[in-house]
């Protein structure tokens, strides 16, 4: 199967709907991915990149249905990682003398993976070009550490197509190839997830490389990535977004993540979140349990945030292993211009919180005062947690919010869907208690999640009938929202 991209350019890649892991198991793919390879047929026939090694035979069979493999004049490998050069060994068995154009660093990577130093390598550097006929040239631009030392981009004159490799891509699989054809919110989510988890450490290089490419004053009508969609409509929007993401990006957002042995640290996290909201309802607060939720989504939220709070129970005088792992990843991602604080519960010794604070400081975060709670937080401790959240909100408040990045939830499409009118965005609100409960009800409110128990409604999912007073609610009752017991409830002051 091939897809026409533009003029004499065709996509000859491979979709992978089922893949879930990338870089071992470090990156979770929620939307599959594609391995994009492109065939250019001018006076010379050029293949740009291959596909993952698992699809080598399918890739070659697909190519053979399109062209005689012997007609390929040369191959361009923009990046030697196996998801781009993986089918090279199988292909070179059929056309062993075909020149391979790549950076000098890529030769080491390709030989290291495929063990064929005898292949016909042709090294290129920024500004080098090859005439492929019909008045068109391929121009090469080295892009070291975006995201490997061997990375480069290739630009096709005449058609004004930039083959950008990993840059501007995303792990996103769809039968449709072009950006204007797919769900724009999904596309934005996957682009941000990809940048925040993979390219963040190289943000300074991203800015420098984009500025270098722009300095060439080359028109860009299309950006053909190595994963995900091809940017056809307004292709420079992703370039502009990358420049924003690379510039110490932060929204008016605070991310809290934690791990907990007995839900004690979770209770603290929820109360801290409520305290932040008390002081600044406009700030987006997200709470994650690292043992239960997607690590890469957490890291994407850290990337978006102006500050983070990291919580852990103390185990053997150190932090929980998953928190330690997250902090190691955060250190490697080298986030800039962000604030942080540690918190956690403990029984004998609160060593975890001290270690988290130290790790966050070492990772370059501006750290605030930590918070420890001994054993299970009681009412007094929960109030202290909430007050801590209030203090954090004040401490991390940004006076001029215009200096923060405006979150973009979707790329802009110039082609509206017929029959659907744009709606005003909904404002996230919590319904007022007065709207749901009468002022004289004998209600109880959960101090962790604010869920309200109303005797007039009962809780049928737990067998508690309408009219059951709080005193008669069984001790086994759990809050339907946060799954904590009766002891976290207080009288509702509606």
Swiss-Prot record:
Binding residue positions for Fe cation 1: 79, 81, 147, 166
Cofactor: Fe cation; FMN
Record key words, sorted: Cytoplasm, Electron transport, Flavoprotein, FMN, Iron, Metal-binding, Oxidoreductase, Transport
Segments forming domain Flavodoxin-like: 254-393
GO molecular function: electron transfer activity; FMN binding; iron ion binding; nitric oxide reductase activity
A family per Pfam: ODP
Zinc metallo-hydrolase as annotated region, ranges: 30-210
Protein family: In the N-terminal section; belongs to the zinc metallo-hydrolase group 3 family.
Official protein name in the record: Anaerobic nitric oxide reductase flavorubredoxin
Organism in which the protein naturally occurs: Vibrio vulnificus (strain CMCP6)
Annotated gene: norV
């Amino acid at each position: 199967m091939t897809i026409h991209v533009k003029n004499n350019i065709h996509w000859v890649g491979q979709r992978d709907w089922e893949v879930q892991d990338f870089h071992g198991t470090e990156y979770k793919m929620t939307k599959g991915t594609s391995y994009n390879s492109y065939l250019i047929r001018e006076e010379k026939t050029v293949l740009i990149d291959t596909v993952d090694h698992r699809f080598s035979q399918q890739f070659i069979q697909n190519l053979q249905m399109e062209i005689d493999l012997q007609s390929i004049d040369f191959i361009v490998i923009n990046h030697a990682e196996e998801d781009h050069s993986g089918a090279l060994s199988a292909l070179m068995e059929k056309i062993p003398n075909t020149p391979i154009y790549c950076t000098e660093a890529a030769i080491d990577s390709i030989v290291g993976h495929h063990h064929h130093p005898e292949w016909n390598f042709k090294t290129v550097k920024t500004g080098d070009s090859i005439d492929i006929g019909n008045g068109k040239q391929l121009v090469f631009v080295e892009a070291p550490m975006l995201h490997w030392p061997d990375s480069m981009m290739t630009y096709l004159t005449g058609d004004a197509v930039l083959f950008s490799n990993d840059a501007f891509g995303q792990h996103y699989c769809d039968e449709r190839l072009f950006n204007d054809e797919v769900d724009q919110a999904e596309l934005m989510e996957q682009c941000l997830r990809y940048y925040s988890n993979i390219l963040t450490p190289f943000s300074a290089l991203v800015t420098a490389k984009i500025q270098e490419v722009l300095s060439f004053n080359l028109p860009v009508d299309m950006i053909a990535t190595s994963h995900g969609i091809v940017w056809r409509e307004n292709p420079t929007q992703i370039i502009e977004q990358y420049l924003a993401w690379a510039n110490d990006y932060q929204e008016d957002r605070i991310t809290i993540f934690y791990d907990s042995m007995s839900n004690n640290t979770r209770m603290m996290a929820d109360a801290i979140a409520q305290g932040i909201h008390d002081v600044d309802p406009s700030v987006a607060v997200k709470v994650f349990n690292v043992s239960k939720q997607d690590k890469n989504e957490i890291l994407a939220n850290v990337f978006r945030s102006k500050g983070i709070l990291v919580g852990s129970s103390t185990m053997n005088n150190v932090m929980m292993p998953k928190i330690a792992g997250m902090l190691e990843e955060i250190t490697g991602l080298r986030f800039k211009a962000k604030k942080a604080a540690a918190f956690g519960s403990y029984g004998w010794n609160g060593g975890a919180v001290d270690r988290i604070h130290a790790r966050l400081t070492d990772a370059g975060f501006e750290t605030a005062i930590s918070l420890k709670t001994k054993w299970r937080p009681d009412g007094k401790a929960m109030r202290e947690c909430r007050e801590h959240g209030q203090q954090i909100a004040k401490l991390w408040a940004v006076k001029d919010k215009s200096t923060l990045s405006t979150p973009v939830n979707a790329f802009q499409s110039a082609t509206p869907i017929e029959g659907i009118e744009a709606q005003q965005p909904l404002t996230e609100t919590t319904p007022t208690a007065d709207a749901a409960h009468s002022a004289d009800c004998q209600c109880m409110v959960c101090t962790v999640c604010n869920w309200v128990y109303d005797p007039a409604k009962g809780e049928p999912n737990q067998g508690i009938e309408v009219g059951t007073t709080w005193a008669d609610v069984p001790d086994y009752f759990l809050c339907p929202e946060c799954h904590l017991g009766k002891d976290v409830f207080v009288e509702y002051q509606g």
